[in-house]
From Swiss-Prot:
It is a peripheral membrane protein. The lineage of its organism: Bacteria, Bacillati, Cyanobacteriota, Cyanophyceae, Synechococcales. This is Thylakoid-associated protein sll1697. It is found in: Cellular thylakoid membrane. It comes from the Bacteria. Keywords: Membrane, Thylakoid. The keyword Thylakoid applies. GO terms for cellular component: plasma membrane-derived thylakoid membrane.
Length: 321
């Protein structure tokens, strides 16, 4: 089976330039119209990690989401944006990162994820609690940010879909599966399989290296990447960064589960990975444990509810941060 990964040098988030780059990126894949049909409800799933570090390249740039939304609308789709941040609401994090003016100009709603229990074909994870909004969407477009990650080495397309696990269920998974990096990586891969994004577009124009996902440093990489196969996308990005896949739990799980593409299966309709090699990508200085103990889960839960139900409403009421 051919697995196409479209790769493009892109240096700018300026609206016109970015829109042109995305058209070029998607054209070999059939354009947005190959993924979105008139009337489709299309979930745009960015990385909305935090509202506390704007400008540090911790989240998918709002310009990327807006440009993709415009292409979806041109194809006749009805885009909406959603995520389940670790702390606070999707709307609150989006507002702090400058999303609202761009989304409002295109009349793009923001949804807060609600959970449902869904069966999988995995022997290890019979059911997963996932976002109803993602599972019920006609089309899911995954919009990850290229970042290092202090627990999982890297966060790319597969890890971004963990944001489709609603609320504090993510913290529970860190407690339940985090003692075994192999099991946690497999859970992330099974989540990605269940969500089954129709298209993944990676924002690597400005990336985040070092002690990510939010305490590292911005780095200009100048890369956009897209594929209908999120596992092929991550495989290729790992190669571009010259990283050992065995050190990345999601990549190791993909290999064990037979999801990594072979060289014969991969095709690159635009740039080839060897033309885009990134030297000296910085990984976290020290990897932190994946597992969360019960006290940390309780603190995290309290912080999440405080931000979502006290701090954010107070900000709306008073107009102050």
């Amino acid at each position: 089976m051919v697995k196409s990964v479209s790769l493009l040098r892109s240096q700018s988030y300026e609206a016109g330039s970015l829109l042109a780059s995305l058209r070029t990126l998607l054209e070999p894949l059939g354009g947005m119209g190959n993924f979105v049909k008139p009337g489709d409800r299309v979930l745009l799933k960015p990385n909305l990690l935090t509202g506390n570090r704007p400008g540090r390249e911790c989240i998918t740039r709002p310009e990327v989401v807006a440009a993709v939304a415009q292409l979806v609308q041109e194809a006749g789709g009805k885009p909406f944006m959603g995520d389940s941040p670790a702390f606070g609401s999707a709307r609150g994090v989006a507002e702090n990162n400058g999303y609202l003016p761009l989304l409002q100009a295109l009349d793009i709603p923001i949804v807060e994820f609600r959970g449902g229990r869904y069966a999988t074909d995995s022997d290890s994870f019979n059911h997963l609690r996932l976002s109803k909004e993602a599972m019920d969407a006609d089309v899911v477009i995954n919009l990850p940010k290229l970042k290092s990650h202090a627990q999982l080495t890297m966060t790319m397309g597969v890890k971004n879909l963990f944001g489709c696990v609603p609320g504090k269920m993510k913290a529970w998974w860190h407690m339940e599966a985090g003692k075994d990096a192999n099991r946690f990586g497999e859970m992330l891969v099974e989540t990605a399989k269940a969500i089954a994004p129709d298209l993944s577009i990676l924002d690597g124009i400005m990336a985040h290296e070092g002690n990510g996902p939010m305490h590292g440093d911005p780095r200009e990489v100048g890369l956009l990447a897209a594929s209908p196969d999120v596992f092929a996308l991550d495989f290729v990005i790992t190669d571009i960064l010259q990283l050992d896949p065995a050190t990345i739990p999601t990549m190791a799980a993909q290999e064990r589960l037979g999801l990594n593409p072979t060289a014969a299966e991969l095709t690159f309709p635009l740039s080839h990975p060897r033309e885009l090699v990134v030297d000296n990508w910085k990984l976290p200085e020290v990897l932190m444990p994946i597992d969360f103990g019960l006290p940390r889960v309780l603190r995290s839960t309290f912080k999440h509810f405080y931000i979502r139900f006290v701090k954010e409403p107070l900000h709306i009421y008073t107009g102050k941060a």
